[in-house]
């Protein structure tokens, strides 16, 4: 029997920092639980591998290249993953099972738009409609 895999891809951004009261042993236990959970979901075809992000970075704009990281420390993006799910709600429910949630991290789940960008189609990058 062929199992039907979810058809939409979602980007998950890991945000925040570990709770300050946690010991290194508690943090490592959460990390180990995460990798076991993540590995199982990759094996099931429900997640794809992602990566942690380094602390340093650059913001590139038309005015300048600025050293980073950016934003408040609680808002820093620490890593990313890809979730495969049938809906945004299903992807969010899957991330609600992430073992590191209980330790202070949070996750932003965003659909990946398969369409090519266009100046004539409203998106998060196009300016508001002109009157």
What are the functions of these language-model segments?
Residues 1-131:
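Conserved, structured core segments of small domains
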């Amino acid at each position: 029997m062929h199992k039907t895999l979810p058809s939409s891809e979602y980007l998950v951004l890991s945000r925040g920092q570990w709770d300050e009261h946690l010991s290194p042993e508690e943090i490592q236990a959460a990390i180990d639980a995460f990798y076991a959970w993540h590995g199982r979901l990759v094996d099931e075809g429900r997640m794809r591998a992602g990566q942690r992000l380094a602390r340093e970075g650059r913001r590139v704009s038309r005015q300048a290249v600025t050293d980073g990281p950016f934003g408040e420390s609680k808002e820093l993006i620490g890593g990313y993953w890809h979730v495969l799910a049938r809906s945004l709600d299903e992807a969010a429910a899957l991330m609600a099972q992430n073992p590191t949630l209980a330790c202070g991290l949070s996750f932003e789940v965003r659909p990946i738009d398969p369409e090519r960008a266009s100046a004539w189609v409203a998106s998060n990058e196009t300016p508001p409609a002109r009157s």
